[in-house]
Structures are given as structure tokens and as C-alpha cells.
Amino acid sequence: LLPVAENLIDKFGKKLKDLEEFGKDKIIREFSVEYMMKVIKSDLKSLSIEMDNFFSEQTMINSNAIETALSTLKDKGLIYNGIIEAPKGKTHTDWEAREQMLFKSTKFDDDIDRPIKKSDGSWTYFAPDLAYHADKLKRGFDVVIDILGADHSGYVSRLKAVINAFAEKRVEFEVKLVQLVKLIKNEKVLKMSKRAGDYILVQDLLEEVSSDFIRFVMLSRNNDVPLDFDIDLMLSKSKDNPVFYVQYAYARINSIIRTLKISLNDQISINAKTFQPNEYEDKIIRKIFEWPKIIDSASYKLEPHKIPFYLFELSTLFHSYWSKGNEDKK
């Protein structure tokens, strides 16, 4: 937050002191959000990640999108004022019965009906999420994919209820839960803490490892599996470094192309009757023919990790073939 504060002072100087508390808070909040969004967009650009749209929760609140979405649900009889049951495993003294505005999510197989507005009149965290998904459907999406942290798994059922309430099962909805990434250096996990303010920033990581390495490694595990990102390993030139291993295979293949003075676009004729691939060639050819299926499966099942897996397997076969060639010059 120190860079935010420093830039805030540079822009406004002592003017902030003369403002009333409400006006001061508004300026600080808006400036901080704008500054951090610039940082986020810059980091994404450094990783060659393009976002078509950034959606502001505040604009949704200002445009009364929550009220509009709730009006639609009220017309369907899915909003009411009531008291939710006490949470399981808690004593009566830990819970106070208060009437709240509730969304009848149990109608769509959720565990309990979800609060939309608190007894003090303020919105719950769920209210903007409800309106946001309603807005997505208004924009004409027939497939909606949410990416959530694994610690938000309890949110899945209520979000499915929202989609079904608005779209009436006319829209395909899927939630991908993403596990945490552990950064490792010198065989030690780099610990991060919100309270202590200890973070490893994307730019810090980019100073150590290239964006290509980061992108490849981040895609090399299924989203629901925790990922250990070993910085030292990513800088090594060994088979244990999957990025280097794939790049090395690519470099070797290009060296063959240069030696033979051919182009990838050249037509190569093979006589199926006389061509007899050896064991290594047969495995490589079979693996290459898997590529279209890998692409289809990765896109259809939303599992991009299958592509790095495939590239590593293909590279392994090629390196084995290369080593065999060094042993047998024929």
C-alpha cells in the first residue's frame, strides 16, 4: 500500500486535509482502486494475458442492478423476508434470530435459503454476485464459467441456484475451483501473510523467471490440484524442468529442419508399403496423431493442463529417439 499512499500524496498533496471525512474517504477509495487496477492490468500484460472486460461491483451498485435483479426474482416468487435456521454445530447463544431478505435457493437444490439484505438494510456479499450473474445472462451468454478459489467451494450451490432461477436451465453453468500455488526457493516455501503484509508480487517473480515459464508451469496442473512452483527448478536445465525439456526438444527439431534444408510447409511423400518405422518412430507418430483429440478434450472439458502434459510426453519420446540416434548413426 505504500506506493498507493505515495502517489496519492503526489497527486493531492495537502488538499486532502481540508476535505470533510466523507469526501476524503471517497477520493482515497477511488484513487486506490484505480491505482491497483493499473497494477493488475500491467501484471496481466506482462504475462501475455488479455482480458476483454473488467467489471466493477461499484458500477453495479450505482446503476441499481441489484434492485433490478431482485425485482425479477420477486416476480417469480423467489424473494421473501424470513429467518434462517441456526448454523449447524453452534449453540443457541452464538446465533441471533433476525428477519432478513432471503433468496429461495433451496428450490434449486441449495442447502439453505441465502440472505440478500441484512436486518440493518445493507447488502450481503452475495447480493452483488447475484446481480452480476443476472447481468451476464442479459448480455446473452449461453455458457457461463466461474473460476473460484478452492476456499469458496461453499459458494457453488448458491451460484448454481442463481443461474437456474434466472435462466431456468437454458444456460450451461460450470464452476472451476482453483487450488493455491506455493512458491518455493532454496527448498523453502516462501510464506505470504495478509496480516503481516508479506507478498511475492508478479513482478518479483518475473525478475527471476520468464513469463513463458510461468504460463507453462501454471497450466501444468489440473486446477483442483495444489501447485508447487519451484523457482530454482525453473532456472535449471534438466529433465525435471518441464519448460526447458519441451523447449530443448523444439530446438533439436529445428536443428534437424535446418540441416535437411526443408520447410514445415514442404510436401513429403511417404510410401506406406515400404516405410517401416522403428520402435521410437512408431511411438512418436502415434503420439502426434493424438494431438487433435488432446485439443478437443482440453477445450471441451476446460482442462488446459492436458496440453503441457502432452507436450512433455511428446518431448520425452523425441529425446529418447535423439539419444538412440546418437548410439546408432544409421
Language-model region placement:
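Non-catalytic interaction-recognition regions
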Residues: 1-330
